[in-house]
């Protein structure tokens, strides 16, 4: 085995044909960086964006793909509190720690963020180097396969639910498009918080799975109007919160499904990013609309603590 190289999934040019598993230089950690031996790495939609278009993100090819991973520490800088062989999961963004947003504790808005698999080499490799502060230790008995799929979907869901105006026990949430990993994570966390959950999908199979996980009701939007069914399920009032990642095609029905003073949180726009605003509905009913991306390091630590207690799993 050559100690200077490793196997990695490397994007050399756009498109599926430009992605291959090949030998690639093994990273040499900087003084403030630790090295992770990757055991498991999750697949996400962003991998497709980066492969096919680059999504307008500043980066250079070749690029090792992958935005989340768990494994064991292969190198730890002195004073980091990490130890070689320790299980750990990675916070996906290297952040500056100096800008106004980092000083406020919100690394998602860092002015100099460098995200794995986007701005810098990612996790589809045998090893990855990241700042030691991005390593979150895991218990010795942690399931690394489950942990490897925790960062993107569940942290995104965590901030959507508990970020700007947290979901409370007894409230009702509408989760749009229950087929995605983020949506399923939202369902798990919402139920854990003591909320009622209604889900939508075009697939009866996905709805059935969500009901088995604990959703109160499922709406197949191919067969019925979402807002009408939501109103029927909530005594004509609407839900307290809508969790959106679809965008244009579902936006109008999502707004119509909210109660007066309700809030909508969006983390994506898979069907288009320019929906009708329906501003009259927004201001008359005093609706709140929030954008949400990823989660902070503090939120990540809270999520991992729940995972370590067995309270959540992908």
Locate each region found by the language model.
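Glycine-rich phosphate-binding loop and adjacent beta-alpha segment
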Residues: 193, 201, 245-313
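NAD(P)H dinucleotide-binding glycine-rich loop of Rossmann-like/cofactor-binding domains
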Residues: 94-177
């Amino acid at each position: 085995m050559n100690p200077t190289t490793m196997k990695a999934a490397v994007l050399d040019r756009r498109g599926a044909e430009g992605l291959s598993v090949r030998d690639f230089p093994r990273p040499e950690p900087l003084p403030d960086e630790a090295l992770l031996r990757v055991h498991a790495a999750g697949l996400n939609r962003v991998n497709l964006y980066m492969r096919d278009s680059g999504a307008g993100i500043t980066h250079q090819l070749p690029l090792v793909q992958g935005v989340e991973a768990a494994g064991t520490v292969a190198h730890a800088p002195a004073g980091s509190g990490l130890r070689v062989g320790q299980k750990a999961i990675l916070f996906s963004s290297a952040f500056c720690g100096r800008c106004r947003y980092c000083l406020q504790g919100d690394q998602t808005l860092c002015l100099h963020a460098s995200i794995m698999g986007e701005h810098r080499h990612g996790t589809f490799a045998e090893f990855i180097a990241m700042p030691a502060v991005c390593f979150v230790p895991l218990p010795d008995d942690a399931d690394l396969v489950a942990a490897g799929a925790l960062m993107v979907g569940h942290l995104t869901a965590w901030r959507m639910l508990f970020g700007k105006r947290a979901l409370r026990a007894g409230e009702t949430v509408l989760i749009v498009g229950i087929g995605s990993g983020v949506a399923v994570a939202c369902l798990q966390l919402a139920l854990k918080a003591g909320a009622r959950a209604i889900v939508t999908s075009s697939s009866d199979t996905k709805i059935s799975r969500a009901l088995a996980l604990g959703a109160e009701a499922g709406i197949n939007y191919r067969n019925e109007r979402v807002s009408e069914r939501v109103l029927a399920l909530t005594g004509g009032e609407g839900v307290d919160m809508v969790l959106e990642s679809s965008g244009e095609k579902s936006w109008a029905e999502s707004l119509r499904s909210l109660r007066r003073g309700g809030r909508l949180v969006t983390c994506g726009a898979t069907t288009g990013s320019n929906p009708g605003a329906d501003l009259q509905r927004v201001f008359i009913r005093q609706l709140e609309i929030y954008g949400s991306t990823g989660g902070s390091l503090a939120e990540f630590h809270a999520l991992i603590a729940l995972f370590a207690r067995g309270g959540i799993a992908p």
